Structure formats: C-alpha cells, structure tokens
C-alpha cells in the first residue's frame, strides 16, 4: 500500500522525475499521499480535489497522484492527510563485481543446499533472458517499459550473483536453485521512483516472496517507502538493501530503515571498499569489488558497488530458507548476523562478513 496504484487517503512525497509542463501554474508533479486508513479513498480524493490519481496502494494507506501547486496546497490542509512527499528518484547503487568462494558458499553446496524452494524478488532494472539464469516470473512498474526484461544490465548482474545456474557455463550464483522473480522498478537508465519501488514491494507481498533484494537507493527518506518496508516485514519477507556508494557516512534509503538489512561492500582482502557508505545502520558485509556476473546480451561482466554486495546476502538468505524452511524472516536475519565473520568496526562492517557455510549448518 505505499506508492502508486490503489490505496486510500492522502499523503506523502512529491514527484521526482521529469515533468515537462504546459503552463507553469498548471504544472503537475507526482506525489505520494499518506492518509488516515479507512478515512480516505482514491475516489474521494479525485472527487473532492479533482486530482489525477495514478495508483492506490492495497497494503499501505498511500495514494500516488499528480498534483498542481494549488491542489497540493489544498491537500496539505486536509486533516485526514498525514503526509505528502515527492515521488523522489531512486537510483542504482553501483560503481564498476568474485565473492562466491570468499563467503564460503561451497560449504553449503557440498551439503546439498542450493536454495531450492526460496523465492527471491529482485527489485531492479529487470532481468534479461540469459543461458545462465532461470526466471520464474515477475512484473514491471515502469510505465514506459511494460516488460520486466532488463534493458540496462544492472538487474541481470544482481540476479546472477544470487542465482546463476549450476550448469557448467559462465558463473555460479550463491543459491543457484532459488526461484528468481524480476520486479522492474528502475528504467533502462537505472532510474525509478519511490512509487515504483513501493509498488514492487507490494507485488512481492502479494506474490508471497521470501526475500527482496534492493540494490538501489535514495538519499531521502519516505513515509511511503517505510510503510511498504514495514508491511513486507510484517508479511514475513526479509528485505536486503545496498548501503550506498558515497564512501562517506549516511546509509541510503531504504537500507537505512530498521526493516532492511543494510549491506556494506568489502574487497578481496576483507577490507571496506573505498566507495562503501558507512554508519550505524550497517548490518552485514559482502564482496562488492570486481564481482563477475551475468549481463545483458548473454554476456558476463565485472562490476563494483554495494549493489553487487547486496545479492550475496540475499543469496545466503535463500540458502538459509532452503535449509530451514520453517524459519521466519527474523530468524533468517538473526542466523546470518550471528554466523558472520567479524571484520572490525560495526559502523563499517556491521556484524561482519556474511558466511554461507556457518549460516546453513
């Protein structure tokens, strides 16, 4: 219920993305309207304020709509509107990806644990068809790109780290037997919005995903996004997110939320990557430098970034879910944290380097 489609009431975020207006006074921008549950519906908002509703969330009390400055001003005065925020841009956490053996994945594989039965939603630029990947399904929340096919490469790269097939070609993913779902929330340029990400989370909830990988981020917080994250957590989904690539303190959203495992990146020596954002929200670390994985055009490329570290953790989460099917999202999270290898300062490395072998014992 956070961003775009179906929800109820008013509140949250302003558009972030484009908007070529006609008359300045009539220019419309996208906002996320957070409302009082049961008090306001998209229909009542349309009728009372004559606004263009794009989406009403089902799981959270948020309406995604286009508003003029005059409409925005009126809505802010509505006592049933808790917040209104711009539908801010969300971008890829990437620089320019090795780490399967580094996190001791082979120990899990040697025990016959490959991720069978775990469902992982990759919220990204989509996933391209590739001989080293098996896509179980998906959806697109980019209006100009109705297919979940990846036209960028980032999502395909992330997907390969999670679950590239054990088929003797290309690369091997952390959980090669996990079910991958391509949820496109970023366009061909690697840009999306708070609304598209919230819709992707909502899709994951409605389609019973176990794990959500979010190798993306925004520097600004969002009531809508936080609502969606909390709803997914309550639905039993483990969310994993990229900390960011600024090299400075200040973890990106949604990774900064307590409902998301914030992932930092380390190099081949187990040292924090120079670009890896740090702060008290960091929960776990994983390989994120020169990571080789699947890419568009049936290719393989090496990329670096916390975007590349995050799917290592999502993959280990899939292995744990496969090893312990009855585990809740919180139990999986606790297992990963308790079995990590200590690396140093928690603000840099969190609980340490994720360890697939110990996590699946």
Curated annotation (Swiss-Prot):
Q: Which GO terms describe its molecular function?
A: metal ion binding; serine-type endopeptidase activity
What GO cellular component entries does it have? extracellular region
InterPro entries tied to this protein? Peptidase_S8/S53_dom (IPR000209), Peptidase_S8/S53_dom_sf (IPR036852), Peptidase_S8_Asp-AS (IPR023827), Peptidase_S8_His-AS (IPR022398), Peptidase_S8_Ser-AS (IPR023828), Peptidase_S8_subtilisin-like (IPR050131), Peptidase_S8_subtilisin-rel (IPR015500), S8pro/Inhibitor_I9 (IPR010259)
What EC number(s) does its UniProt record assign? 3.4.21.-
Segment forming the signal sequence: 1-24
| Record's subcellular location | Secreted
What is the name listed in the Swiss-Prot or TrEMBL entry for this protein?
Thermostable alkaline protease
Q: Which organism is it from?
A: Halalkalibacterium halodurans (strain ATCC BAA-125 / DSM 18197 / FERM 7344 / JCM 9153 / C-125)
Instruction: List the top taxonomic levels of the source.
Output: Bacteria, Bacillati, Bacillota, Bacilli, Bacillales
């Amino acid at each position: 219920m956070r961003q775009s489609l179906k929800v109820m009431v008013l509140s949250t975020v302003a558009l972030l993305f484009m908007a070529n207006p006609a008359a300045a006074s009539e220019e419309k921008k996208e906002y996320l309207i957070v409302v009082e549950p049961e008090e306001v519906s998209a229909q009542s908002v349309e009728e009372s304020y004559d606004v263009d509703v794009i989406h009403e969330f089902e799981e959270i009390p948020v309406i995604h709509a286009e508003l003029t400055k005059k409409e925005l001003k009126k809505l802010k005065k509505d006592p049933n509107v808790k917040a209104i925020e711009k539908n801010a841009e969300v971008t890829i956490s990437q620089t320019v990806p090795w780490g399967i053996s580094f996190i001791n994945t082979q120990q899990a594989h040697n025990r016959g644990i490959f991720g069978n039965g775990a469902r992982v939603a990759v919220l990204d630029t989509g996933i391209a068809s590739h001989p080293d990947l098996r896509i179980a399904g998906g959806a697109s929340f980019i209006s100009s790109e109705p297919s979940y096919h990846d036209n960028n490469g980032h999502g395909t790269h992330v997907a390969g780290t999670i679950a590239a097939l054990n088929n003797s070609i290309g690369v091997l993913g952390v959980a090669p037997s996990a079910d991958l779902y391509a949820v496109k929330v970023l366009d061909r340029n690697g840009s999306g919005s708070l609304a598209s990400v919230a819709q992707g989370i909502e899709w994951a909830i409605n389609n019973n995903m176990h794990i959500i990988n979010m190798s993306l981020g925004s520097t600004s917080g969002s009531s809508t996004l936080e609502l969606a994250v909390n709803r997914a957590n309550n639905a039993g989904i483990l969310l994993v997110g990229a900390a960011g690539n600024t090299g400075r303190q200040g973890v990106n959203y949604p990774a900064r939320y307590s409902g998301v495992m914030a992932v930092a990146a380390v190099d081949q020596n187990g040292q924090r990557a120079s670009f890896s954002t740090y702060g008290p929200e960091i929960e776990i670390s994983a390989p994120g430098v020169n990571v080789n994985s699947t890419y568009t055009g049936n290719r393989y490329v090496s990329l670096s970034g916390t975007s590349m570290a995050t799917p290592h953790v999502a993959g280990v989460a899939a292995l744990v879910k496969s090893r312990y099917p009855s585990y809740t999202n919180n139990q999986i999270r606790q297992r990963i944290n308790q079995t990590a290898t200590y690396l140093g300062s928690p603000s840099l490395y969190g609980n340490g380097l994720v360890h697939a072998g110990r996590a699946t014992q």
